[in-house]
Amino acid sequence: MDDMCSILTEEELSLYNITDCEFVKPGGLGPVLGPRHLSALVFYGLVFLLGVPGNALVVWVTGFRMPRSVTSLWFLNLALADLLCCLSLPLLMVPLAMDQHWPFGPVACKLLKGLLYLIMFCSVLLLVLISLDRFLLVSWPVWCQNWRRPRKAGWVCVGVWLLALLGSIPQFVYVKEVQLSTSKSECLGLYTVASAWANTTARFLVGFVLPFITIVTCHWVVYSRARRGSGVGPGRVSEARSRRTLRVIVAVSLSFFLCWFPLHILDFLVLSTPRHSSHSANIQLAHTLALCLAYCNSCLNPLLYVCLGRGFKQNINRSLRNMFNFATEESVTRQSMFKSTSERTQEMNM
């Protein structure tokens, strides 16, 4: 593979803020990691440790412990996408720990970056789908009763994954492993300036602005309908339910905004900051942290969308109790078997 500094133009080097041509040490992979890079690694590690068990538990409960329904299919696919997001974190931590050196080869570079955006798009689209489903349930309940079926929901989920694949095609096409020096290579998207701005703008509009507007609007309609119906039945119960709905709406909207907005803003800052700027290194590190913050949304989704539901909490409590009882019974059985075996051995020796 040719040296990157010789095959890329000055415009492309400036576009990606590549300073490695000047600063990579001939004998190694770059400078020693500083406190900020270590903080980013710790942040990634925490998201991995929290996100994997939480989403794996949701996948297990919605996939194997709950009756098949439209809602369980939404949450199963959302948890599966979030679980895959969190499982990819160690592969992103390795280049971060090696000063952005990519050690996995060109095929893994293209596949990982493409699948990463596919899964992230899928997670966002599923959040929009869940919001639209709640909107339809309160706006057209009769239509939902006639047409809202698990089989149709399964095909909708397939369509969501295909749309996410369509949105991630640029990553599969343009991302490549490039050699910066004899001892360092990076996994980068080799766009032109025009295509980079177009791709980033489209990702911002389709991956953040439209989903955020949809999520907020749908949940606000749900809250308005719930508050309008709070006049029916016991006042305190209805008022408490309305407040609970409002808290969920605020939590869902804020988590989506706070987790995704910084990443999209920093995408634009990375493109607009000259590579010789004194702020370039800090912006790159901030972009790394913003990407991890977007992963935090995968940790929060099980709590916000699933665990707040009473039916799910009952199923998860029942499942955990069954697991605990099974482990306890198995331990007792092993102890009794060991005890009886020891007694028989002693009798034979007497």
From Swiss-Prot:
Glycans are attached at N17. It is a multi-pass membrane protein. It is found in: Cell membrane. High expression in head, kidney and posterior kidney, lower levels in peripheral blood leukocytes and spleen, low expression in brain and gills, heart, intestine and very low expression in liver and muscle. One of its GO terms (biological process) is positive regulation of cytosolic calcium ion concentration. The chain crosses the membrane at residues 38-64, 70-93, 111-132, 155-174, 198-223, 248-270, 288-308. One of its GO terms (molecular function) is complement component C5a receptor activity. Pfam families: 7tm_1 (PF00001). The keyword DNA-binding does not apply. The keyword Disulfide bond applies. Its main location: membrane. GO terms for cellular component: apical part of cell; basolateral plasma membrane. Disulfide bonds join C109-C187. Residues 1-37, 94-110, 175-197, 271-287 are extracellular. Keywords: Cell membrane, Chemotaxis, Disulfide bond, G-protein coupled receptor, Glycoprotein, Membrane, Receptor, Transducer, Transmembrane, Transmembrane helix. Residues 65-69, 133-154, 224-247, 309-350 are cytoplasmic. Receptor for the chemotactic and inflammatory peptide anaphylatoxin C5a. This receptor stimulates chemotaxis, granule enzyme release and superoxide anion production. Belongs to the G-protein coupled receptor 1 family. PANTHER family: C5A ANAPHYLATOXIN CHEMOTACTIC RECEPTOR 1, CHEMOTACTIC RECEPTOR. This is C5a anaphylatoxin chemotactic receptor 1. It comes from Oncorhynchus mykiss (Rainbow trout). The gene is c5ar1.
